[in-house]
A protein has these predicted regions:
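Glycine/small-residue-rich hydrophobic helix-like segments
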Residues: 186-238
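Conserved catalytic-core subdomain
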Residues: 215-293
Length: 293
């Protein structure tokens, strides 16, 4: 890969403010940073992202990659971030011939912190179903336990999402940002810029955010067949996951989870002990679900 002219514009992810607690006592509290960063591709304004500012170069490259506006890292000549003007300039050797057409086909999504996806990606015909990846329940539990050590910004300040590339129960790479889509884009950009190879090793993607259509699309583009979240799933996310062969694990907290499109891919080798009332609670959830349907 040719050398990229890359700025190093990392900023602190938290700052302290004065707050008053419920007893009227003043104290200092860490809060998550949130900064606007306008992305320019060969002087063409693309989007303004709200970000922590931890890895802005990786974020903008990953954004362009995941939106289908950048086909390979070898096309990138320079990535320069200037926080004084809140801008990131990406210079490439080539641009998609239909760039203007792609930019005109933006769809507002349910993603917080970003919320757009280009029409070419929603068409989804360019993506083929992924080979099935099997996941053992015991591996999922170990992974969830291991992930607890990585949410440093969330523990100190809250108000951020985290995403991770994982190989079974091993965390390969972890990123936090104010939006879950920023976090996945930063991971994608980091893998390209650092050429670490961990994306190729990853078979599980973890996010703290909802499993929406945009999240499923981005993970499918990365070739990862298992998507895990501590949050819930949307209708379009379920539909696209079925099309691409992505196993969804939603509401994964502690020893609880909800698997979608599991088929024979989820190996139930570590069922947790049932507690009094679990059966009644499950029956009530099924009854409520049936009434809503």
């Amino acid at each position: 890969m040719s050398q990229i002219a890359l700025s190093r514009a990392r900023l602190p992810t938290t700052l302290e403010i004065s707050v008053t607690d419920e007893f009227g006592e003043p104290h200092r509290q860490a809060i998550a940073a949130e900064r606007a960063l306008t992305l320019y591709l060969n002087r063409r304004e693309i989007v303004t992202l709200m970000t922590l500012g931890a890895e802005p170069e990786a974020l903008v490259v990953g954004y362009l990659r995941n939106q289908g506006l950048l086909e390979c890292v070898e096309d990138v000549e320079a990535v320069q971030v200037d926080w004084e003007v809140e801008a990131a300039a990406v210079v490439t050797r080539h641009l998609p011939e239909d760039l203007e057409a792609r930019l005109s086909q933006r769809t507002v999504t349910t993603g917080c912190g970003q919320g757009t996806v280009f029409g070419r990606l929603l068409d989804a015909t360019a993506l083929t179903p992924l080979p099935p990846t099997r996941l053992a329940q015991s591996v999922l539990y170990r992974l969830l336990d291991n992930l607890g050590a990585y949410n440093e910004t969330y523990r100190s300040a809250g108000a951020v999402h985290g995403c991770a590339l994982c190989q079974q129960d091993r965390v390969l790479d972890f990123v936090e940002d104010v939006g879950r889509h920023n976090a996945v884009d930063t991971l994608a950009g980091r893998q390209w810029l650092e050429a670490t190879g961990s994306e190729g090793e990853a078979d599980i993607f973890y996010t703290t955010g909802r499993l929406t259509s945009e999240m499923v699309l981005k993970v499918a583009q990365m070739g990862i067949g298992v998507l895990v979240s501590r949050s819930g799933v949307t209708q379009k996310g379920v539909e696209l996951a079925e099309r691409f062969g992505v196993l969804l694990i939603a509401r994964a907290k502690g020893r609880h989870f909800q698997a979608i499109h599991a088929d024979q891919r989820l190996i139930l080798d570590a069922p947790p002990p049932k507690r009094p009332g679990d059966r009644d609670a499950a029956r009530a959830r099924r009854k409520t679900s049936g009434a809503r349907g």
